Design a protein with these regions (language model features):
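Non-heme Fe(II) oxygenase catalytic core, chiefly the N-lobe of the double-stranded beta-helix
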Residues: 2-226, 231-265
Length: 265
């Protein structure tokens, strides 16, 4: 049985586990179940190297390949402007990654915490009639939307690089488990068939609702930490830090397990 402790009532659990048992996948099924139920799992003091981090990721599912700047599925995260705004990874692709595993290699002297918000719980707390209405809507997700604030004065080259990243997704993800979660965040450009002003207002309201303190866990990093989150049921963002600090995180992602299809698919 896993030794766990809830970090907040609605999101996040700390897991105390022997590194050898973790890498051997002894508790893999329990970890996957807990991850889906709690959204974020924190393991402290593991000091896993990149090979061990990959081995742990592989106990959760197939390691996702193909993102920019990756080495055998690993992404070295220094500073990606869009990550400072609430988002879900891979909303342009179907299926999006199931989970993400992150470990720090160099920490900034201040700032750089990572926050997570529970999109399952946020949906569950909406009135039933609003839940049903939102479940009829589709949203266009674009990299341009995600970069609007992160790159306030884009070049033509920026626009060209963003053009290929677009997807139409349901506003509410109906999971195979029967649960539903909101698909929102910085990549959400606009709601199909809705006036752009009404669309903006609704998306902003849902984001403010979902990122209330009661739905959020904020992780303050220490060397040796490993954090894994359910990318299909959470939003996340990095808090600001000194970009000259050399902060570096190593990341692996797990292939998606279920599609985020359009309503008409």
């Amino acid at each position: 049985v896993l030794n766990t402790r809830e970090l907040t009532p609605l999101i996040g659990s700390e897991v105390v586990i022997d590194p050898k048992a973790l890498l051997a996948g002894v508790h893999a099924d329990e970890i996957r179940e807990l991850l889906i139920r709690r959204g974020v799992l924190v393991m402290r003091g593991l000091d896993l190297d990149d090979g061990q981090l990959a081995a742990f990721t592989a106990t959760i599912g197939k390691i996702r390949q193909g993102a920019m700047h990756e080495e055998n599925g690993m992404l070295k995260v220094l500073s990606i402007p869009g990550t400072h705004f609430w988002h879900i990874d891979g909303t342009y692709t179907d299926p999006p990654p199931f989970a993400t595993v992150l470990a720090p290699r160099v920490l900034a002297p201040g700032g750089g915490d990572t926050e997570f918000a529970n999109t399952y719980a946020a949906f569950d707390d909406l009135p039933p009639d609003e839940q049903e209405y939102l479940s009829t809507l589709e949203v266009v997700h674009t990299m341009k939307a995600a970069m609007n604030y992160a790159v306030p004065e884009p070049t033509v080259e920026h626009f060209q690089s963003w053009q290929g990243h677009r997807g139409v997704r349901p506003l509410v993800w109906r999971h195979k488990s029967g649960r539903r979660s909101l698909v929102i965040g910085a990549t959400a450009s606009h709601i199909l068939g809705m006036h752009f002003a009404d669309s903006y207002e609704l998306l902003q309201r849902l984001l403010l609702h979902t990122t209330q303190d009661k739905y959020v866990y904020r992780h303050r990093w220490a060397l040796g930490d490993v954090v894994v989150w359910d990318n299909t049921g959470t939003l996340h963002r990095a808090r600001p830090f000194d970009l000259t600090s050399g902060r570096q995180m190593h990341r692996f992602a797990v292939e998606g397990l279920e599609p985020l299809a359009t309503l008409s698919a």
